Amino acid sequence: MNWTLTNSSLDKDSITSNGNRFLIGNGYLGIRGTLEEYRKEYFPAINLAGIYDQVGEGWREPLNAPNALYTRIEVDEVEYQLPKIEPRYHELSLDYRHGILDRQTVWASNKGTIIVKSSRFASMKEKHLVVLNYSITADYDCEIIVYTGIDGSVWDIHGPHYDKVEFQKQLLRHNETEILNEKYLLESESKWNGHRLSIAAQTHENKDIVYVTEDIICNKEAKIELIESDKECLRKLTFHGKAKEEINFTKYITVFTSKDCVDYKEQSIKIVNHAKDTGYERLQEEHKNVWEQLWNISEVTIEGDDEANDALNYSLYHLHCIAPRHSKSLSIAARGLSGQTYKGAVFWDTEMFMLDFFLYTQPEVAKTLLRYRIDTLEGAKKKAKLYGYEGAFYAWESQEGGYDACSDYNVTDVFTKRPMRTYFKDKQVHISSAIVYGIRSYLNYTNDFSILAEGGAETILECAKFYYSLLEKKIGKEYYEIHDVIGPDEYHERVNNNAYTNRMAKLTFETAIDILDHEKNKDEEFYIKLLKQYEIKDLLDKLKDACNKLYIPKPKDNSDLIEQFDGFFELEDVSLEEVRSRLLHEKEYWGGAYGVASHTQVIKQADVVTMLVLFKEEYQREVLQQNLNYYEPRTEHGSSLSACMYSLLYCMCDQPQYAYPFFMKSALADWNGKGKEWAGLVYIGGTHPAAAGGAYMTAIKGFGGFQIENGVIKATPRLPKHWVRLKYRVLYQGAIYEIDASKEQVSISKIEM
């Protein structure tokens, strides 16, 4: 395995796609894999985790920092930029074992050849640090001009987000620092040590500051001029290049926000200076060492299938890039740190699709993700109250403080160009159960019950109260129902008794009962605290009653099929191809009140199948199989979340040959850059961390058959026919275990740390 992804395409679509595919990041920030000379029309972005802004009536979205990677060149008064001037050769190369992006471009001029090389990484050791090494070589004598500095004209979807931009320049000479207040021209004879550039960009909404500092070290003296406008501050470096002489410089960049610390300016400069003293090679070595530590536990080896092996580990690379290791309470957005799609909001994706990877390899990160939900409980309670419910109704698109960024109008009609009313925010009530499922999974795997006293217990109980307040009972009926919801499918809105939603509500009731019982027996002091906060006896009686009487759709008479929601089987039963043929526009939204799928049995993504994966022990094998056979041909898989659930259920039915294509669809979601990029006229492109997490779940839990049974690791592999071996490690309750599975045998061994 060479751990390298390469690409040479330069068409507009490839440039956008490569921004996602060649992303580097360290959890604090993500840097799209665009070239140094690209301006905002090519979607460059240094996307920041957990900080947002709203401009006017536009959608609230995460911030992209001013671009301090910006660099362009002129050779003998000719600008050499991609894609403006076609190169003789060009390649992007991502070392996804170590998060290093390399670029090589070769141009032919009328005098000879010009070669540009660059290498960048977002330091995994120092979260605020980004390093770029850049070189230019011509095979003839020429004048080379490099423009490099900070581009403050940032790509935004609903921006611009900075209402005030202030540049600061410092001239460094013989350990002296002089603040420059105007454009400055220096000759190389002035014994120049460099200019350090900074930008302070202030947001509209909260007046937060994003502070970016950069400095360079160059291997050759130059004539230097500072060029400043409202949106950029650049050095103009003029070199007298000799034939085959490499001009090389390293940029040391720091990114801070005013949310990080009070003295962000001082810290920014301090880290840049330390980085310069440390040097490029040493910084890269330290960065690579952190990556090696991560891969020591998380690498998965698939023998007999190089494509699957590469794609899966590349998927895990993307999860590592966006893991908030720097925080005690932060989650992961649906598109990671690849941009502002979906408003940089946190969805159910994190708990249901990504959590297992972190739980099995970095439990402390899993706890960080869950703490985010605990810390946004008040926002969930406010939302529930707003809609007239009790307890905690979590945000469908969660931002700071649990604020729900989801709009009432998420889709634009392609024909009228008018916004369409959608009900994701109002009716996808299954979101709260995802948080409970995540906490329950964490408790079961880690046996770390401290999270309950840190707010986890209250979170579970408030979610249980929320679902109890949703229950309805028809006159003359003994069971409860849940009406007017949207299940995972999403194309069918405002339905009654969605099977997944109802079963997850029951899981929430069960979990609340379980944790109250646990705390009563294990932590009397904390239980007494809960007694003071809640009417525990009354609450327990209600939850037990709800558990016993909540209607969960069961297989129909004379059939093993479970109806997705009331009346689903009465909808038009038509093929996926027929529904697709009814589209009048390629970007037309399939769901909602008038979508082509809305009145048919065609669904967007796994719904009943997701329920069966989570609660497989409650159903006979034939029920699992028949529902797979029925729902899969009717599923569009319009979401990257869908394929892994079908893959998992096929594995549970001992059909790895059918699971494999769905596994590969998840694993290749970002590798090949062919993910869905539009919902109506709304751009939804970016990386797909839920698909990455889904690929991991399928490999480990599906093909690998990994599970914890009574505190003991078990593995019952169901490998695809062409797989020779599946090997992986997990961190379980403080110890590393290696599971090595072939078709003949399985070994589980404890690894000394």
Curated annotation (Swiss-Prot):
Entry's Gene Ontology BP terms: carbohydrate metabolic process
InterPro entries tied to this protein: 6-hairpin_glycosidase_sf, 6hp_glycosidase-like_sf, Gal_mutarotase_sf_dom, Glyco_hydro_65_C, Glyco_hydro_65_M, Glyco_hydro_65_N, Glyco_hydro_65_N_sf, Malt_Pase/Glycosyl_Hdrlase
Pfam families linked: Glyco_hydro_65C (PF03633), Glyco_hydro_65m (PF03632), Glyco_hydro_65N (PF03636)
GO molecular function terms listed in the Swiss-Prot or TrEMBL record: 1,4-alpha-oligoglucan phosphorylase activity; carbohydrate binding; hydrolase activity, hydrolyzing O-glycosyl compounds
Subunit structure of this chain's protein: Homodimer.
Presence of the UniProt keyword Glycosyltransferase in the record: yes
Highest taxon listed in the record's lineage: Bacteria
A cellular-component GO term for this protein: cytoplasm
Homology family: Belongs to the glycosyl hydrolase 65 family.
EC main group: transferase
EC id: 2.4.1.279
Binding site for substrate: 348-349, 604-605
UniProt-recorded name of the protein: Nigerose phosphorylase
Cell compartment(s), UniProt: Cytoplasm
Species for this entry: Lachnoclostridium phytofermentans (strain ATCC 700394 / DSM 18823 / ISDg)
Keywords, comma-separated and alphabetical: Cytoplasm, Glycosyltransferase, Transferase
Function: Catalyzes the reversible phosphorolysis of nigerose. Also shows a weak activity on kojibiose.
Thermal dependence summary for this entry: Optimum temperature is 40 degrees Celsius.
Reactions accelerated catalytically: nigerose + phosphate = beta-D-glucose 1-phosphate + D-glucose
Catalytic-site annotation from UniProt: 490
Activity regulation info: Does not require divalent metal ions.
PANTHER family found in the cross-reference section: GLYCOSYL HYDROLASE-RELATED, PROTEIN-GLUCOSYLGALACTOSYLHYDROXYLYSINE GLUCOSIDASE
pH dependence: Optimum pH is 7.0.
Lineage: Bacteria, Bacillati, Bacillota, Clostridia, Lachnospirales
